[in-house]
Amino acid sequence: MSKLICVAKIGAAHGVRGEVRLWTFTEDPLAVLHYGPLTTKDGSRSFEVAKAREAKDHLVATIKGVTDRNAAERLNGLELYVPRDRLPETDDDEYYHADLIGLAAETTAGAPLGRVLAIHNFGAGDIIEIAPPSGSTLMLPFTNAVVPTVDLAGGRVIIELPAEIEGEDQDSSDNAGSPEGDAAASNSARHPRESGDP
């Protein structure tokens, strides 16, 4: 069975005719119209987005079978999922967040660092967050220089630790993940595609 990927979250009702605010986690917000039925995480409920239009930072959507405000309000907060195999294939150096989360992280020397916890973008580029077995998480630029290898088949990413981090003890690693400095500016960025964090 294909892994489920969260592609949208239903927000508050919009108007009195059953429309809802819909936050999507896809590169193209309107792509949710083309994925077919979307389900809850447990698969117990299925929804189809009949139509949608873009608003400020979300969509205003009509869900098939939802015809009044009361029905729309009952859906508030629901996350909507699609099987991974329904999503488009990625290009080289392009990855879905869900495919990266959980991968083992190790240094170029083969030392284990932990697991990929999340991919963030705070406006200055993509950041990979790695959770070590203990201690604070590492936040590193998700660039070709810092993450030279993404091995989805092998279930791992290889990390070239920036010079300012290498050799630091765990107590000083709180600021180690700062995307500033040479590592953030070096080489080209990778391109994780949002599809939900899961």
Swiss-Prot record:
Residues 163-172 have a biased composition (Acidic residues). It is found in: Cytoplasm. The keyword Metal-binding does not apply. One of its GO terms (cellular component) is cytoplasm. One of its GO terms (molecular function) is ribosome binding. Binds ribosomal protein uS19. An accessory protein needed during the final step in the assembly of 30S ribosomal subunit, possibly for assembly of the head region. Essential for efficient processing of 16S rRNA. May be needed both before and after RbfA during the maturation of 16S rRNA. It has affinity for free ribosomal 30S subunits but not for 70S ribosomes. This is Ribosome maturation factor RimM. It comes from Bradyrhizobium sp. (strain BTAi1 / ATCC BAA-1182).
